[in-house]
Amino acid sequence: MSTQNGMYYSLLEWFKTLNLNAPHANAEELADGVALAQALNQFAPESFSDSWLSKIKSSAAGSNWRLRMSNLKKVVEGVYEYYSDVLNYTLQHDFVKPDVQAIAEKCDLTELERLLQLVLGCAVNCAKKQSYICEIMCLEEELQANIMRALQELETSTRQTTEGGVVSSLSRNSLSGMLDGNAKALQSQMTEERDAMAQKCFETEKKMLLLIDEKTNLQQELQKIQQEFARLEHNTIGDDGVSLGPIQAGSVRYNELRRQLELVKEELLQSEGAREDLKIKAQQQETEMLHMQQRIDELMKSTAVLITLKDEVDVLRESTDKLKVCEAQLETYKKKLEEYNDLKKHVKMLEERSADYVQQNAQFEEDAKRYANTKGQIELFKKEIQDLHTKLDNESSKNVKLEFDNKNLDSKNLALQREKDNLLKERDNLREAFDELKCGQLTTNSGSLTGTTMSRELQPPAMMDKIQRLEAENKALREGQGGQTALAQLLDDANKRCENLREQMKTANERILSLSHASQSDDPILKENEFSKQIKQLMELNEQKTLQIEEFATQNSTMQCKITQLESSLNTREQEVMAYEVKYRKCVERAKEVIKNIDPRIASVLEANALEKSVDVIEEESKTKMSGMEEQLMATAFYRLGVNAQRDAVDSKLALLMGSGQTFLARQRQSAPRKSLTTMKSK
């Protein structure tokens, strides 16, 4: 066991003691991350749940190192989250995060040692830490010492956070950025070295070409010299035609040739030295070329590795982009799910409110049934009012006749008063002329005074006040009723009644004229007494009728107030129901959109149809109930309009009968108008 990997083998021996389903005897079996994930699930099943364990792919044990790297990455991220969230620890920067790629590709023991050290920290700090500590104590002393040293290193590299913050580790984006930066640096360095080597190769090739050219030139010169030497050796005549003589020792030719030979030897030695130097340089250049070729091969291998690293970086970038998109989609789905839950709650509230509205509609139906009974009473009151109107018409015709009679009596009374004044004047004259007959004249005058004052005593002061009050009210009613218009049918009825009354008036006038001619011959005082009695009886009957009409008017006004209150409450309810229906439809539409956005593959047509059917049923029920209430309210409003129109017609008839062409006494005898009519019209 080496000292460098002693801690790793100690941690591996401890890890072998765990009861796991996956194989975990060596580094190759641990490199897929399945055994580590099962161990974490065994340590803290609440944090490393079965759903998390299902994400670890057990098929990564083969040659696919990317699957192993993804499993190890999930394990490392889960461990860091466990340290930050559950244990409330933050790993400092001096503790290097395990290199997942090195473990997955090369089964690096140092990186695997760091990962096992983190797993050991999870085991010692979990809920079942006593049992795991006992298992560690059962190991050998050397293993225990190494495990304790690993725990101490882990404790020194962690610090506890008071706020339970999250571990600050390199994300996928930073990792891809670092890999990209390293790849770019390596690529730039390799390109620089390759350019330098290419430049050196180019220079050496130039030098080699120059040396080869020099070598060929020297060889050519050597051949020329040898040829010249052979020629000179065999020729006895020089170029200038001078005889050179035989080649013998001591001769001039021999000496000249000897001298030339020495020069050639020296040149040959120099050329051989240069050749040796060139050979040495060529060998050096060849060795440099071989070294440069090896360097170029290494650079090509590193470029291939760099290309693979680039591909991996691109894959990581794509995976990070996909992860970002998935995280954004997950956040949107979470928000939509929250909105869907809110919509569910809102729909429940709306259902409860709709149930309340159904109960209220049932109460309104019961109230409508109760008011149906009052409808019959209103019809009875209508019939009674019509009977009273006919009676009132009869009484008004009688009253008109009596008014004409009263006019004739007033004219007679005025004539009698004039005669009285004349008699008073004559009395004064007779007082002066006949003083002796004073007593007799006084007796006669007293009788005449009693006769003349009887007509004035027939009218008491209360009657005069009442007549004045009635006249003022009649004027007010005429002014208030001048701008009102009745319905067409009621106007036709009123016109027909007016024509009947005019015919009755004609007949009454003819009768009055005949009676006036007949009464001129009779005693006026007796007739005035009879007419006054008849007028009193008619006034009493008229007051009784007015009291009855006022009672009916008060009852009708109370019923109208109730009907108006019910109409206002019904209108408010209708507005509330419409507002809630609009809100309900909006909520249903939003719920449909949320369901479609959450999972568009699932056909949510059934739920939408069910909601639409429920909404249609509620709308039909509310429409039927509201239509019944509207019919009832229309009937009551029509009856109320009929009563008001009849009253207006009666008042208009009374106003026509009480025209301005009457005398003072005729206006005084008119019946008092109903006080409630003006108040009801104002309402």
UniProtKB/Swiss-Prot annotation:
Keywords of the record: Coiled coil, Cytoplasm, Cytoskeleton, Developmental protein, Endocytosis, Endosome, Microtubule, Synapse
Family annotation (Gene3D superfamilies): Calponin-like domain (1.10.418.10)
One GO CC term, this protein: centrosome
Domain of life from the UniProt record: Eukaryota
Main location: cytoplasm
InterPro entries: CH_dom (IPR001715), CH_dom_sf (IPR036872), Hook_C (IPR008636), HOOK_N (IPR043936)
Domain Calponin-homology (CH): 5-123
Molecular functions per Gene Ontology: dynein light intermediate chain binding; microtubule binding
PANTHER family referenced in this protein's UniProt entry, alphabetically: HOOK PROTEINS, PROTEIN HOOK
Subunit and partners: Homodimer. Interacts with microtubules via its N-terminus.
Summary of the function given for this chain in its UniProt record: Involved in endocytic trafficking by stabilizing organelles of the endocytic pathway. Probably acts as a cytoskeletal linker protein required to tether endosome vesicles to the cytoskeleton. Involved in modulation of endocytosis at stages required for down-regulation of membrane proteins that control synapse size. Not involved in synaptic vesicle recycling. Required in R7 cells for boss endocytosis into multivesicular bodies (MVBs). Has a role in regulating adult longevity.
Protein name: Protein hook
Organism: Drosophila grimshawi (Hawaiian fruit fly)
